[in-house]
């Protein structure tokens, strides 16, 4: 009986995954003009060059453009990570989202693929068993390995632990802020929560001060319940200011995080 129940769970999950993957493919290949803010449409054009292996790539020696760096910094403030390759000289970026946010990750993948920094194969939903035994759907992809990413890894990591880099102010643009919120923000009452629990208390305070000075966005800290972990909460009075700055970059599937302010 137990085996039969497991079989039913597996076949149901397989059908669900197949349906989700089919819907993702339709979304990925849909025309994006009119669907996304004008800023992104040029970046989300149909692939001109299909890159599925390293020999297809032509930008390994080019400097990173400012928009790419801002997107990387915004992503690293959230769930993204930079990985120094073992036995190699370069670094790659890894992007991860829960399956419920697959549209955002597909958007990010298509964007970065069109900029020439990752494989153009469409990411696939995967299943994982969490520590409490629940089945989770996740979706992820990584960039190619670049020497140009080494400086970013050096700035963001000390002894393998993510830290807030000294040059964060230089790259915390409205674009980076939008990417950070889409990646790791969450609606909380009339404000917005950012999961900053991976950063130290002083780093969270630094981010709060930076947003205040740079954009006049006020925020507070909330303890997460775990020792020495804090989340940021952007106050409702600052939400109109925030939305005005980031609205040109927010994709449709992430508008819900900003509630009625969008």
UniProtKB/Swiss-Prot annotation:
One GO term (biological process): RNA splicing
Q: Which GO terms describe its cellular component?
A: mitochondrion
Q: Which InterPro entries match?
A: Homing_endonucl, LAGLIDADG_dom
Keyword terms of this UniProt record: Hydrolase, Mitochondrion, mRNA processing, mRNA splicing, Nuclease
* Main location class: mitochondrion
Q: Indicate the family of this protein.
A: Belongs to the LAGLIDADG endonuclease family.
Look up the further comments and give them. Answer: Encoded within intron 2 of COB.
Listed name of the protein: Cytochrome b mRNA maturase bI2
Q: Which organism is it from?
A: Debaryomyces hansenii (strain ATCC 36239 / CBS 767 / BCRC 21394 / JCM 1990 / NBRC 0083 / IGC 2968)
| Gene behind this protein | bI2
